[in-house]
């Protein structure tokens, strides 16, 4: 396509519309959507062709089929031809296919002229909507009857000319042959009458055929109008159905979104309820855990305390036996004696027993329970108090009591000398982590016996032995276990309080963490909602950007190609000019050389002239001198 055609359309149509860019690329091969945008913009700005298209046709999305595109363009072409009166060679099928860009540009130019001249298109729009069609020459051709009428008119004109010629010939013959007989004239008149009758019959038949053709054409036009109206109604129904489907889809989408929002709200409410229930259940669980731990520790302490009293009872029985041995009136108890010995509280021994009882009470609530002995007897604290006043006989089946270590205070008490002979050697000291051997278990009567009035030299030895026993007693296995359980039991309430404090601190910190996490989740939700809201417009923008980018890239490529072509053409022109200028440059150099040569010659001639003038002056002076002389 020539660039002049595109420039002409840009000049003419650019005065009418501004919106769709009238680029050479688009005008060289205009797509249908581009033409649709141009027509809609012309209708919007100038009002030309207003009322020609329905609202559905004004949207390019509804005009996608080939037939609808052809009908759209045909309407515009018919209106433009009726308004302008100029014939247009543009065919809508070729325009839709992308061919004949020059003819489409001519159509656009004619539209621009009509808009600039402010020609009204109301009558043309009405005629086109009524169904009037135009031929390529610009004349309305509603039916074939018009062509027939034209043909018949031509035939009438020919018949008239023939009649005139016959009359002229007859007149000339009359003038030439005045002497012819009247019979010939009558014959001619008969012939003329016959011819006239035949012609009139033919004319009547022609008129009848014309009327029939007109009726047929009218019926055809009516049928065409009916079919067009039916098609329009169908198109309207289709458009209405499409709009209804779109409305239904929109309603469904809205319902889905509302349903989703409701489900989200319900899920949030459920999560909040669950969190509240969890928050309510957590302090209960912590309290139950603390109670379980306390119960477990109490049970463990009770079990330990149940296992403790056996050595204490044995030590008490052994102490009672030693006290009996100290008194001068008592006889050493044989190993086969049954029952238990109990000594009343007297002096330092009573204080020792009080100390042991206080230790038992400090160890826990298990001290108040009945204490089981090794032989299966059970002793209560009330029974222990009664044994101070009344002693039960020791059973023969009882196991021998463990050796009781005498404290240093007891050595100061006076003991009778009568027990020295009957007293046995002191029991061997229990080592760390070792139990009594079988030999020691077999010995029934190993008790600690003290002298009534030991000599002063023997006192330090007894004291050293008691100190060793005390040191060894600290490292005894049973005593060690008792002390450990006692320490554990004493430390258990403090540990419970610490654990409670820790649990309270941990719960407070957890609540703070939950609040922080909830705030962060709310922030994330709000940010996600904003992102989702901005996603749809962003997607639409991206779609439009993609279309614009494609067109811009194509335009850029075309401009680059044009730039390259222009650069190449410029280089070629420069080469051509250089080739043309080179001989001129040579000629110029030659001319300059000739000018220099001529200047040199002129200078030489001037010098000769000056020399000749000098010679002439000399000659004149010599002549004048000679004449004077």
Swiss-Prot record:
It comes from the Eukaryota. InterPro entries: TRAF3IP1, TRAF3IP1_C, TRAF3IP1_N, TRAF3IP1_N_sf. Residues 130-511 are annotated as: Disordered. Belongs to the TRAF3IP1 family. Component of the IFT complex B, at least composed of ift20, ift22, ift25, ift27, ift46, ift52, traf3ip1/ift54, ift57, ift74, ift80, ift81, and ift88. Interacts with ift88. Interacts with il13ra1. Binds to microtubules, traf3 and disc1. Interacts with map4. Plays an inhibitory role on IL13 signaling by binding to IL13RA1 and recruits TRAF3 and DISC1 to the microtubules. Involved in the regulation of microtubule cytoskeleton organization. Is a negative regulator of microtubule stability, acting through the control of MAP4 levels. Involved in ciliogenesis. This is TRAF3-interacting protein 1. The lineage of its organism: Eukaryota, Metazoa, Chordata, Craniata, Vertebrata. The gene is traf3ip1.
């Amino acid at each position: 396509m020539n660039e002049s055609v595109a420039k002409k359309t840009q000049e003419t149509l650019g005065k009418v519309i501004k919106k769709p860019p009238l680029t050479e690329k688009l005008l060289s091969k205009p797509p249908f959507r581009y033409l649709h945008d141009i027509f809609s913009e012309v209708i919007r700005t100038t009002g030309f062709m207003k009322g020609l298209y329905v609202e559905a046709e004004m949207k390019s999305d509804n005009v996608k089929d080939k037939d609808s595109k052809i009908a759209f363009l045909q309407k515009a072409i018919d209106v433009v031809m009726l308004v302008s009166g100029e014939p247009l060679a543009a065919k809508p099928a070729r325009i839709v296919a992308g061919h004949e860009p020059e003819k489409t540009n001519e159509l656009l130019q004619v539209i621009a002229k009509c808009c600039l001249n402010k020609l009204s298109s109301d009558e043309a729009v009405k005629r086109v909507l009524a169904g009037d069609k135009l031929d390529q020459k610009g004349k309305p051709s509603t039916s074939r009857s018009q062509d027939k009428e034209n043909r018949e008119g031509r035939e009438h004109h020919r018949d008239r000319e023939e009649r005139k010629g016959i009359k002229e010939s007859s007149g000339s013959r009359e003038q030439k042959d005045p002497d012819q007989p009247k019979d010939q004239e009558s014959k001619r008149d008969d012939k003329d009458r016959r011819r006239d009758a035949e012609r009139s019959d033919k004319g009547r038949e022609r008129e009848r055929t014309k009327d029939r053709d007109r009726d047929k054409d009218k019926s055809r036009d009516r049928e065409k109008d009916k079919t067009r109206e039916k098609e329009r109604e169908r198109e309207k129904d289709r458009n209405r159905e499409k709009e209804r489907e779109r409305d239904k889809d929109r309603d469904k989408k809205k319902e889905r979104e509302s349903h989703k929002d409701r489900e989200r709200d319900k899920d949030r409410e459920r999560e909040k309820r669950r969190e509240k229930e969890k928050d309510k259940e957590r302090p209960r669980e912590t309290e139950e855990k603390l109670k379980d731990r306390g119960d477990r520790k109490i049970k463990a302490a009770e079990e330990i305390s149940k296992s403790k009293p056996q050595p204490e009872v044995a030590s008490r029985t052994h102490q009672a036996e030693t006290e009996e041995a100290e008194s001068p009136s008592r006889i050493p108890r044989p190993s086969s004696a049954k029952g238990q010995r109990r000594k009343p509280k007297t002096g330092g021994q009573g204080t020792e027993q009080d100390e042991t009882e206080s230790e038992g009470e400090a160890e826990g609530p298990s001290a108040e329970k009945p204490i089981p002995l090794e032989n299966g007897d059970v002793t209560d604290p009330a029974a222990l108090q009664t044994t101070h006043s009344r002693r039960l006989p020791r059973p023969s089946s009882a196991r021998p009591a463990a050796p009781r270590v005498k404290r240093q205070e007891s050595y100061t008490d006076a003991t009778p000398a009568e027990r020295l002979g009957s007293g046995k050697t002191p029991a061997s000291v229990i080592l760390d982590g070792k139990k009594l051997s079988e030999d020691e278990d077999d010995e029934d009567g190993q008790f600690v016996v003290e002298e009534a009035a030991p000599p002063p030299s023997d006192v330090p030895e007894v004291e050293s032995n008691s100190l060793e026993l005390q040191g060894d007693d600290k490292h005894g296995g049973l005593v060690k276990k008792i002390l450990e359980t006692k320490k554990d039991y004493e430390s258990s309430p403090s540990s419970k309080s610490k654990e409670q404090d820790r649990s309270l601190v941990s719960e407070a910190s957890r609540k703070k963490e939950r609040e922080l996490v909830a705030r962060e989740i709310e922030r994330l939700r709000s940010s996600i909602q904003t992102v989702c809201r901005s996603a749809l417009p962003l997607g639409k923008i991206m779609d439009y950007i993609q279309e614009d980018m494609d067109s811009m890239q194509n335009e850029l490529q075309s401009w680059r190609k044009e730039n390259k072509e222009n650069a190449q053409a410029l280089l070629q022109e420069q080469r051509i000019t250089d080739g043309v200028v080179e001989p001129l440059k040579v000629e110029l150099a030659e001319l300059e050389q000739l000018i220099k040569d001529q200047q040199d010659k002129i200078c030489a001639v001037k010098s000769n002239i000056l020399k000749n003038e000098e010679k002439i002056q000399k000659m004149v002076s010599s002549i004048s001198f000679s004449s004077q002389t």
